[in-house]
Design a protein with these regions (language model features):
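Hydrophobic anchor at the start of a short beta-strand
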Residues: 26-27, 74, 172
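Residues at the C-termini of beta-strands that transition into short coil/loop
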Residues: 7-9, 30, 105, 112, ...
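Amide-donor transfer/coupling interface in amidating biosynthetic enzymes
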Residues: 110-197
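Redox-cofactor binding/interface segments in oxidoreductases and associated redox assembly factors
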Residues: 43, 76, 175
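Short secondary-structure boundary/hinge segments and terminal tails
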Residues: 36-38, 85, 128
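Cysteine-nucleophile active-site neighborhood
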Residues: 48-124
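Cofactor-binding loop segments of dinucleotide-utilizing enzymes, especially the Rossmann-like FAD-
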Residues: 8, 79, 177
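N-terminal beta1-alpha1 cap of cysteine-dependent amidohydrolase-like domains
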Residues: 1-57, 62-70, 185-197
Length: 197
């Protein structure tokens, strides 16, 4: 099995290390040709506006969209979830107008849990995965779903309230958090099970 990890900005190295620990071939995706013959794609956390601009500048948007529409699973973590969402607003600034792939029927609020200093670790329960330890760093909240998208897990937070932190639509997973920081393999195993189907 070959899993591509978008390697333009952000914490892609941590995802690659975990995939290799799981015995999966991980490939860096930096240009459209790197998407050939992969069984799944991870879009990592980082700065969503920067990653989106780099996706656009490197002409990766349409090839990624075609890949996902063809049935190849994708997992977006934190900034990756923002890029997968069809609707994006910022908790403070409102409408962002930022580039996004817009593949999932979800609406997200950027920085929903506060700024960098409001980062936190949590144990959450996700449908299909179970309990997992994860990190929230300037994370988005999933506040709306429609169509075939469904929320897999929620968190109760003093700033954001009760909000979704994971959503799935077919082979697409949007995660508000960073599973790679804690290294909880259950989330990766779930994603890899989608790639094996």
């Amino acid at each position: 099995m070959r899993i591509g990890v978008l390697a333009l900005q952000g914490d892609f190295l941590e995802h690659v290390e975990i995939l290799r620990e799981l015995g999966v071939e991980a490939v860096y995706v930096k240009k459209p040709g790197d998407l050939a013959r992969i069984d799944g794609l991870i879009i990592p956390g980082g700065e969503s506006t920067t990653i989106g601009n780099l996706i656009s500048a490197r002409n990766l948007g349409e090839p990624i969209s075609e890949l996902v529409r063809s049935g190849v699973p994708v997992m977006g973590t934190c900034a990756g979830a923002i890029l997968l969402a069809k609707k994006v607003v910022d908790r403070v600034a409102g409408e962002t107008g930022q580039y996004r792939l817009g593949l999932m029927d979800i609406g997200v609020v950027r920085n929903a849990f506060g700024r960098q200093r409001n980062s936190f670790m949590a144990r959450i329960s996700l449908d299909g995965v179970g309990e997992a330890s994860v990190a929230f760093i300037r994370a988005p909240a999933i506040v709306e779903t429609w169509g075939d998208a469904k929320i897999l897990g929620y968190i109760d937070h003093p700033i954001a309230g009760r909000v979704g932190v994971a959503a799935q639509q077919g082979g697409m997973l949007a995660l508000s958090f960073h599973p790679e920081i804690v290294g909880d393999m259950k989330i990766y195993s779930y994603f890899l099970s989608l790639a094996r189907k």
